[in-house]
Amino acid sequence: MKRIYFLIILLSIVCGVSAQETLLLPFDAVELTPEQKISSPIYLAYPLGMKNDMPIMKCDNIEAVDLGLSVKWATCNIGAEYPEDIGYYFAWGEIQRKVSYVWETYKWCRGSENTLTKYCTDSSCGTVDNKTILEQRDDAAAMNWGNEWRMPTSDEFKELKDSCDWVWTTQNGRNGYTITSRINGNSIFFPATGYTWMGNEVVKVNQLASYWSSSLYAANPIYAHRLYFGENNIGIDDDYSYRYKGYNIRPVCP
């Protein structure tokens, strides 16, 4: 009955939107098949109006893969059940999902890029504390999956890039990179998850992806380091983005 109710609402919305307009769908509002989830171009982080203060539990099938590197890498993103699933988007240093990703809703500022309240190395950007790595309480991996997990640093992303072969491929309908260790041959898959745009829109799914590191871009603290990739580009060296943006997170553990 609940599913029918949501479908009726959804159909009434769709009927009032022209084919040229962008329709933002609350991702969990209806029960979608895996194929529908893959083909749907737009995702919101969680249903509009839903209170979101519960941890995002790690699915039982998620494992830590030993690639012969300094850390082990999870098989899935936070919020994902399978490696090809998108999972959820987070602003840097925030541990909960939300609907809108803009400076005005960012936890660690007072509404703008020059009013940072934490993780700041420049007085022109806010209150200086010289913190450059996320504390555990602000690490979405640790706070949602447990203390044995955390977000990777920018150096760990660089190690992943430099020590593995990256092959653009498609897994169960999702484009992304199969990343295979040159040390022991083990592999993981990073899906092309897109990224948030203009606050609550997600774009470039199956084309591009951004994954947060736990490392601040100390030269300008309104940014943090990320892994960014597309089919013909893999960026981590000096790749950074605005902290308020919603990107995915791939946890690591010892």
What is the predicted function of each stretch?
Residues M1-I4, Q20:
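Positively charged n-region of N-terminal signal peptides that target proteins for export
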Residues Y46-P254:
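Conserved positions within compact, well-structured domain cores
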